[in-house]
Amino acid sequence: MTIKFPPRSDWRHFNFAERMFLPDLNEVFGGRGIGLYALAFLLLLCGLSVLHTFLVRKSAHHIPGPLLARWTNLWLAYHAYRGRRYKAVHAAHQRYGVMVRIGPNHISVASPEALSVIYGQGPRAPAKSPFYDSFVCNGKPSIFSTRDRQDHSTKRRVVSHAFSSSALQEFIPLIHSTIGDFTQRLDEFCLKGEYFDVLLWFNYLAFDVLSDLAFGERIGMLKQGSDLVEIQRAGESSVHENAIALVDEREHLAAIVGIHPFLQVVVNSLPFLSGNKATSGLEELGRRQLIAARGYDVRSPNADEVAELTAEAVTLLIAGSDTTSNSMAVTLHFIATNPRVYTKLMGLLLEASSGQNEMSYEQAKDVPYLQATINEGLRLHSTTAIGLHRSAPPGGLVCCGHFFPEGTELSVPAWTIGHDTELWGDPDVFRPERWLEGKESRQYLLAFGKGPRACIGQNLAYIEMISVLATILLRYKVEVRSQELQTTEGFMHKPLDCWIKLSRR
């Protein structure tokens, strides 16, 4: 099984980029002289970028990297725009070594030793960098996007009760109920005997589960068989838009503009860009669901509270739906394309379920090989493939023998760590057994981040992935249409699709 990028002309992310920028600019300028406007804009951006380098460059000058990256963040922004940032950074590490300059003030450190330094705890630990400002929703930083430690601690205390062990135990029956809706739709595909894109249905499932948690009621994508949601932006009439496309465009735009401060300023000042429209659409979706489910009134004194809750709800929908749906799709694909793993896992699941074609989460979680298979899928695919940005604290820090002054941007590339031969031995092989061999492998799994800013919802994600994959494998025989999995990257690394055919066991 290989992970393969599609031809450049077919990249879904390139279409995202065109939708985010080019059509809107044509609309604004009436299609006249768009090339000149774009060229002038790029020249101005390059000039400002180089000027910015001279003003803020702080990090060790001797660290090598691509020539353009030494002088401007546009090298990294370009690869993010093309949906191949993690590949470009990985290639740079293969050429230049453990430490690579991927921006004038941004050093990528491909070393396991760097994880505890860059993503560590305590008052001297690096904080999130300005990169995360591009993810701010509704003008209110969420638990994910806030850079302030105290604000993050406050938000985490407020939100953490929803992800506590007791709260998740109460939520498990609701997850199983939603999985029931999911299997009803899969049964329909069984009867047809046709290939279908299960990634879409994983997305619908994730949205329904997370909206139930965030708002107290499901959006209902599984039942309607569509991700169309009603959106009404300020001053506009109500329209129906695809929620998955909104998530993809918003997340991809944020991953690009967060790299460069001038891009953030320019893009934020252009509300007509469809990437910004995607952001406003998600904010409106979260606000409407919140008001409908919880009875909030935006005209009341609680309007600020609604904005705060909307920011958290939108963050939960985006991060949760992307992580779980993509991870379930690639893990199912890895299982189905590795007969040895498929046969071994099925034997263990059938034994644990006493030969039945269904099992509870409580039963499934006690099958260690299932969780090992999920961890291996998370490692090999690397749902979060990029390095998560941090800023060196006041007084600077020492990492891997190098001193970095205050404000230096640092990151550890998740894809490169997940495919490190010294760590894994055979990193390109799908081998779940590595997670059961007694090694401390879990500390190098970066799918949910690392340290005090790691994803607060990762336990919920595991509950969902374990429950869903156990259900599918016990209930159906799975056949994939292609041995290759084509992927793209925004902030998350995701498959373009996952075509399978099911038959009942």
Residue ranges and their predicted role:
Residues 393, 398, 412-438:
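Conserved cytochrome P450 K-helix/beta-meander segment immediately N-terminal to the heme-binding cysteine loop
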Residues 157, 314, 319, 360-365, ...:
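Cytochrome P450 heme-thiolate "Cys pocket" and heme-binding signature region
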Residues 184, 191, 218-219, 339-342, ...:
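Cytochrome P450 heme-binding "Cys pocket" and the immediately downstream C-terminal segment
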Residues 60-64, 81-83, 165-169, 361-368, ...:
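Conserved, non-catalytic sequence blocks in retroelement Pol enzymes and Pol-derived host proteins
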Residues 127-136, 170-326, 344:
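Cytochrome P450 heme-thiolate monooxygenase catalytic core
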Residues 68, 172, 176, 232, ...:
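Cytochrome P450 I-helix active-site segment
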Residues 323-336, 468:
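Short, small-residue alpha-helix embedded
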Residues 2-154, 176-185, 205, 278-284, ...:
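N-terminal membrane-proximal hinge/A-helix region immediately C-terminal to the signal-anchor transmembrane segment
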